Amino acid sequence: MDFYSSLLPFLILIYLEFCSGFNRVCYYNGWALYRDSEHALKPENIDAFLCTHLVFAFGAIDETGTRIYVPEVFEDMHLFERMNELRHRNEDLNLVLSVGGWDMGSEAWSEVLASKDNMQTFVKEAIVYLRLHDFDGIDLDWEYPTFRGSKPIDREKFTQLIEIFRHEMDIEETPDDKWDLCLSVAVDPSEYMSSSSYEIDKITKNIDFYNLKMYDFHGHWNDPVLVKHHSALTSSSSLPSVNELAKMWVQRGVPKRKINIGIPFFGRSYRTAQPNATIGDPALGPGSDGGIGIPVSNICHLIRGGTKEHYLKEENVPFIVNGDEWVGFDNPRSVREKAALVRNNRLGGIMVWAIDMDDHSGWCGEKFPLMMSIIHGLGEYVDYMSDTLEAEREMINKKIRKAAREISYYSDKGNSTMAKKMEDKLNQLKDHLSAVQAHQSVQWANVQYSAGLGGKPLPSKDTPSWSW
């Protein structure tokens, strides 16, 4: 082997470490379709280039512990098919099914783990289900092994389930690597919960990545109930933060590429005993949302309406006070800074819960402002715009090619009237393409200019969000 050949494996590792893109894992809550018209998000209205992985939440497990299913209401709305349509715009988009969630609890998972036969059957049936509905992978979101009725032995058994998944996925015959299914696990990243629920070293070997829920560090469920931000970026105390937990997971020996940092697109609220409460003050319970979380698309309305936004210096995250309600959340600035943490430390990427909670309608400004902030923070804005503009041109080119085929067809059939009609349509499409290309050239110049400045600059922290 010559010197240059011996360098090849090393160079490949360098490329994978520093040149490959980041994961942008976006959970999509199926129930988002049933919100009021302004906040409802249909699958077809999702920008197909915002995410590398679009994760449907949630699939459930039947009473036998051997099969996955989704509520009939989702099947009736053909949500899977509508999500698949996004691939016509972006063929590289990965569609993933997340199974579990908080509402499902532990009982169904324990049924899966009841025997080795159950686990084998569940995994094989799951793979069939994924292939039937054209999913690219599965995300296991058990909340949480060894808790909520789950036995201590389930920690070890969950590892066994994951090992069976890995084995069955590896032996599945596929045309090429692009068809391989991916396997991820959504976890509570705190030291106590993750150590109690998971055999991290064994699981890590068998999954593609972790989706770390870097939120809900605090909330109305704590005793005593104190006002605290639920997703602090940094902290000078012993309180959990995104920065410290990310370090902990790397120190555990988890490869950086397998760590996706979770960002909440919702706020956590408290009803306070006194107005203008601050961090550490006692709270009476959850705020007006009843503890379910307030979508950022709602919070931006309040800020645009004049509610003053504040910033926590130690935690580097924002909050608002609305009467006796205190709400901690993430805004475009804090989201971008969390994404920059991922970029600077070469972690695997970002996970968001959930894309349907972003301002997808553009009521407060640009559409999907938090996702766009993530793209800027990861340094992927140029690639995103390149893909988006190319897809826009390709849609028109497809219509041009179709019109050309129809001209040929009608000419061969001797139908000059229809051939002329198609020629007119073809000319209109070509004119439209020229106009789009002219507009895109201006857009691209602005993109390049912004990239030369290091990305869209952040204003001062005193500048209200959704005003820049």
UniProtKB/Swiss-Prot annotation:
Keyword annotations from UniProtKB, A to Z: Coiled coil, Disulfide bond, Glycosidase, Hydrolase, Secreted, Signal
Under the cellular component aspect of Gene Ontology, which terms does the record hold? extracellular region
Q: Which branch of life, at top level?
A: Eukaryota
Annotated disulfide bonds:
C26-C51
What's an example GO BP annotation here?
carbohydrate metabolic process
* Molecular function terms from GO: chitin binding; endochitinase activity
Principal localisation: secreted
Subcellular location(s) of the protein? Secreted
Q: Which family does it belong to?
A: Belongs to the glycosyl hydrolase 18 family.
Write down what this protein is called: Putative chitinase 1
* Source species of the chain: Margaritifera margaritifera (Freshwater pearl mussel)
Source lineage: Eukaryota, Metazoa, Spiralia, Lophotrochozoa, Mollusca
